[in-house]
Amino acid sequence: GEIVTYHYNAAGQVESLTSNKLGKESTLIAQVGYDKDGHTVYTKLGNGTETTYTYDKKRERLEEMNLTAAGSPIMQNKYRYDAVDNILGIINTVDPQSQSSINKAKLGGASNHSYQYDELNRLIHATGKAKNASYTMQMTFGRMSEPLTKVQQVDSSATARNYNLVYKYEDESHPTAPT
């Protein structure tokens, strides 16, 4: 078995995690740092990767997340929100694929995702692009907020995965009632 131990600071916040699996000790999370409002602003994992988080001072929403390994940037996400805090977009501006010494598998890369919502704040449209792949997704809802359709199209050089789902309910006047 494995025993995971949470270590806390004086404020009761997790500051590190360790593991003991079959007698072998390891560090899962070496350090977690917080700001005065209790937001996580820094994490260092057991593998040495470090992440910093920046928040909007007025609305306390995550604005930016930066991930580094061996001092080199791996990911730099920037987040956008609407007036009611729905996330409108995530952009990663770092392309770590050129860093062959720390990214032998050539994972990650620049990406851009956008989201749209209806007047009830339900996700109705999403688009994104990363590497050589892109996707679109659209959803519709009924009067009781039940999903009616979901159409997703994925296009990449390696594969294309598309689907079109139509949801049907036995009792249209009570679509969310148990049957």
Which ranges hold each PLM region?
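Acidic/glycine-rich beta-solenoid
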Residues: 1-179
